[in-house]
Amino acid sequence: MNPLKVRLGALLVDQQLLKVLLNALTGSLDASKSDDESTAVYQVLSILENLVDLNPEGLFGRDSVVSARTAGPAGTASSLESDWVNILEYLAKNRLPTKRVEVDSNAQYASEILAIILQSAGGRLRKRFVEELGGVDVALRALAGYRTVPPETPEQIEYLENMFDVLCALLMEREAKEAFIAGEGVELMVLFLKGRTAARTAALKCLDFATTRYGKAAGVCVEKGLLGLLFAVFMGRSSVKGTAKGGKRRREREEAATREEEEVRCVSILSNLFAGLGAGSADVDLTQKRQRIVAKFLERDLEKLRKLVEVMVVFAGRVASEEARIGDVFEGEDEDDVKEEVLLAKMDAGLFNVQQCAIVLAELWSTENEFALRKGIVTMLHEVELTLKFLKMTLTDYADSLGDGDEEEVEGTGGDAAQRQVRRLISQLGTD
């Protein structure tokens, strides 16, 4: 972080800039009255965006105590946080449109600023937005207007993308996951998947975030008919209505990138569903829902299993290539000194995707009395010159990366539980 930018951000906050901007927005400016005032509102929003860019951690305080210098004259983190809550309230209640036709440049920009703030802020501010201002409901209502009819104008397209970003930022918090389920967020995302519009990819991302380390969401997803839609996307049987623009090559690149993103989202969601539905659970309902996932992999001569292996192999190849490349770059360096950089490079190449594929394969392997799956896994791995040992090594590295499991427990699937799940899968894979 540039120290000059950090200093400038602190000075601006010291001078109560947030309060000045909020007073301008709520007092003297009304974007609906004239073009001049509409332009002024846009400029104020631009100042907010630039302010966040100066020093996100210092301006929001993250989840730690903010220094008196950064927190303003009141000298407290809470006063700074309250200023941001007021900004969020203004954006949510006054700048977000209630109808599709009302999305203009200011509404689009307000949704962008809202997303930027929530992505940059710490969990405490996101939780307050959820609990005090109904943030999840705000996002769901904004998205609901596009559940069957796609956006038509450039402003509507960007507005929809921004509101999905808002929802995903919120879904990093447990409180938001709970509100998402209560507000029928799963049902709304299912409608987006059925609509086969460009919003489908964003809907998958939301479901991925909602099901991550939150067991309750897994059961709801199965109940609401997600599996059929999820596998249709994963297998490429549910195409999105033409959205890519430009020449043929550009369209092909965009479509390939979208296709790949959707595949890895599907795998991640499946991994989350298995974790949330708990193997060996005494709950009959959870066991039955888990079995419904397994049954999907048994259909059509194990085609979904083969697809899963194919996806894993693609990313494993990229990771291996990157590992070799970066090994040459750091040749002669102490291994401990470059360990973090090597790991980051492998993650960028797709290591996490390989790990998620391995988890799903191991979950299928661990299913009782499904010998066809075990035979299929061994056979398909052998076809690509891999064995169960590769799965075990991948999962062992992943379990080690989970650390000491000090993350917040969320419905039994966070922190320690996530590591226990992976260790259980490793043990059930046995010896190669």
Residue ranges of each PLM-predicted region?
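Hydrophobic residues within the alpha-helices of tandem HEAT/HEAT-like
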Residues: M1, S28, V41-N55, A107-A121, ...
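Elongated alpha-helical scaffolds that mediate protein-protein interactions in large eukaryotic proteins
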Residues: M1-Y109, Q119-D137, T153, L170-G183, ...
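Short, highly charged low-complexity linear segments
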Residues: N55-E57, R128-F129, A199, A203, ...
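Alpha-solenoid helical-repeat scaffold
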Residues: A217-D432
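Buried hydrophobic core positions in alpha-solenoid tandem helical repeats
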Residues: L17-L25, L48, W84-R95, V138-L143, ...
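A compositional/structural signature marking long, glycine- and acidic/polar-rich segments
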Residues: D137-R250
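Amphipathic, alpha-helical segments enriched in basic
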Residues: L114, E155, F164, K205, ...
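Residue-level detector of extended alpha-helical repeat arrays and alpha-solenoid scaffolds
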Residues: S34-V44, V103, A107, R126, ...
